[in-house]
Regions:
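C-terminal catalytic/acceptor-binding lobe
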Residues: 1-26, 172-174, 178-249
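Short coil/turn segments at beta-strand junctions that form active-site/ligand-binding loops
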Residues: 12, 35, 85-88, 189
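A structural signal for short, well-ordered beta-strand segments and their strand-loop junctions
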Residues: 89-92, 131-136, 191-195, 235-237
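Conserved catalytic core of nucleotide-sugar-dependent glycosyltransferases
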Residues: 98-182
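Short, solvent-exposed loop/turn segments at secondary-structure junctions
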Residues: 23-24, 70, 95-97, 138-141, ...
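Active-site-proximal specificity loops/subdomain of glycosyltransferases
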Residues: 40-92, 97-110
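Basic, amphipathic N-terminal segments that precede the first structured/catalytic domain
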Residues: 1-72
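A short acidic (Asp/Glu
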Residues: 27-29, 49-52, 100-103, 143-149, ...
Length: 249
């Protein structure tokens, strides 16, 4: 959905997309946090989301629903819709619970609005010349840093994209955000990650979405795929378990 995001130093329109599968019950909560958005959902799921939208008394003009297929197909459909409007694409997972920022002058993180987070990301992207932006990969404030990193993994739960030519690899069903980060670094030599913006999602435990596809074999298959595509010098083990990786950038 086309939205206008304005700030003191920066203002523009963006396309807000929520990537979802099998979780129509999340529509009300996401609307309260995010506002108007287009929901990109799995094949043959639209009617369930339409029913949930009606039960939640949400406006069809503010909560649009598009059947777009699997995970990466949905991500790419959102990018292409943003391209048609000539605006950056904001993609969110469907289980956002809160957005905060960690000030170096405060002991605890402070809540911020969705629009404010987008403004900060876009301002930093423009300032450093990046075309993919995002937030800290964990919502744990212990790991927050008052800095922007230009060579770092951008977790796909909250991303801003303004290069419409780079698309997600539709051969992937998991860990597609690692590949997408590398595509941007390969082409543009940088990304933009705000390590002081913390977004809390429930995707590790919430049913549906990518979690429903997350099995040990699929995780390992996607890791092998990434290693073949980018090399073992770039795709490194995390040291925590065999299902997690890190990028050597």
């Amino acid at each position: 959905m086309l939205r206008e995001i304005r700030g003191d130093l920066y203002g523009e329109k963006v396309w807000v997309a929520i990537i979802s599968s099998d979780r129509p019950g999340n529509m009300r909560g996401m609307w309260e946090l995010v506002g108007g958005a287009t929901w990109y959902v799995g094949d043959r799921q639209a009617r369930y989301y339409e029913m949930a939208r009606e039960l939640a008394r949400l406006s069809p003009t503010e909560t649009q629903i598009v059947e777009s297929g699997k995970l990466c197909e949905s991500r790419n459909a959102a990018i292409k819709d943003a391209q048609r409007h000539g605006v950056p694409c904001v993609e969110l997972s469907d289980d956002l619970r809160k957005i905060e920022w960690k000030s170096p002058h405060e002991d605890k993180p402070l809540g911020i609005a969705f629009e404010q987070a987008i403004r900060w990301i876009r301002e930093e992207m423009v300032a450093i010349g990046a075309h993919l932006g995002g937030v800290a990969p964990t919502s744990n404030p212990f790991f927050a840093r008052s800095e922007t990193r230009d060579k770092a993994f951008i977790v796909g739960d909250f991303i801003v994209i303004d290069d419409h030519e780079l698309l997600f690899d539709e051969q992937m069903c998991l860990k597609e955000d690692y590949d997408y980060t590398l595509q941007h670094i390969q082409k543009h030599e940088k990304v933009c990650r705000l390590d002081y913006v913390l977004a809390t999602f429930l995707h590790r435990t919430n049913k549906g979405g990518a979690v429903s596809d997350r099995t040990g074999k699929k995780e390992l298959d996607m890791i092998d795929y990434l290693k073949k595509k980018w090399g073992t010098q770039v795709i490194r083990p995390s040291g925590r378990n065999e299902y997690e990786i890190r990028l050597n950038l």
